[in-house]
């Protein structure tokens, strides 16, 4: 492994390898993560940690990586470069930074650390990750007073605070697997995705674990093409048994929710394949969708959906009233329609409500909510917004090991009207309204309003527009940085930063706009509001 840094001299890098593990073809993909401590350790020093993995790697490869430290405003202050060898095991690179730029201490402010990594000659797209860090003691943003919305412990009986928003917040993990596909592994044996239908723990165990962990919602989202017990095709598979397994999962979720009021157990599917495809969740389908057949020509599903035909899938989802989520989207090569990645269709816009913005690593065995390996997808979600999609942000764990909701403190916050019970129907209604926020801190909340209207709304406006970022931090946590982001649906351009304050009043240009808020806490955890969509007249 080689590394270089400009303008600083090279530092020693520590490399550690985890155990190699075979991976089903569904998870053969390059993964790169960046852990950048938000606050410095001793004096001004801190260490950035790069993680590289390639489940199912067929032959050794070289990762070329670049890390940039960007000043407030975006100018590059430092750049490190290096290489790492991939031999089938996970690789960790420690990158120390002294807190200095050249010979001088870095001025105080909110900086950004960016990782760009690619497997040499592999053909897969490069992976980019970016996180903010605090250098010195930056000035804190002024935040409006905001009374935190009641959570599940008080809902639905709790009345909103005087002048408060009439909603209760329910916290969920909307992406996980059990032994109905390639998840559900015992923690001590979980090194990656499991051979389909082989692990010990199913939906009942997942719902009970997540409930005990304090979640309000867990979605078991099983890979739709693994109900035959194979990551490929199984000629001798029993089609009736595959369909029955999906129905058993639905029944399990219904029974758990009925027996445990206040907890919503969801069962659905993660449709698609990752390579030359793209994964998406469907939360409310009572039908198993698929394309594989056995040797008799029997469909391993209730309803045939051509593999990779996202336009047809969106149309079917609209006809059935199903609601979906873009899972860990890549910026290129996924969700193709007519050869265009992340392509907009009116049907897709109607049914796709969420986009995962940050996930903890799918194969974590952490049960103390302290996992440091996370993947960041805000840039891909922004491309979907710029394409014209009306999606809110979510953050989930994609658990494949038996730690549903326990790998980190990230949750998707779902706003249900006060007085309305949490149910599958009220959950789906909230998703359709995009009343959702993503938080890496389960105790914090973020709601964006626009002229008093709720995030997720679409409305016409004349004259000034007032955006207010309403943030309630968990105990002892404060906002360290605020950004209001803006874009134009259908433009297919770049989302830009409108403001670094928690309130902005201005008159937009005529036409279509969207705005969302991002808040970074003083511990580095980040929250994203749902956007608002404004037609300025």
List PLM regions with ranges.
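A glycine-anchored, Pro-Gly-centered beta-turn/N-cap motif
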Residues: 89-91, 107-111, 511-513
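C-terminal functional module detector
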Residues: 59, 112-126, 136-147, 152-168, ...
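Histidine/acidic-residue-rich catalytic or RNA/ligand-binding cores of hydrolases
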Residues: 230-231, 277-279, 334-342, 402-418
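Solvent-exposed serine/threonine-rich low-complexity stretches and specific carbohydrate-binding patches
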Residues: 77-95, 493-502
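A metal-dependent hydrolase metal-coordination microenvironment
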Residues: 149-320, 326-327, 334-336, 365, ...
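Contiguous beta-strand segments within globular domains
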Residues: 28-64, 459-468
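Domain-core and long-helix interface of multi-subunit machines
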Residues: 299-405, 475-494, 507, 513, ...
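Signal that preferentially marks extracellular ectodomain short beta-strand elements
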Residues: 94-108, 503-507
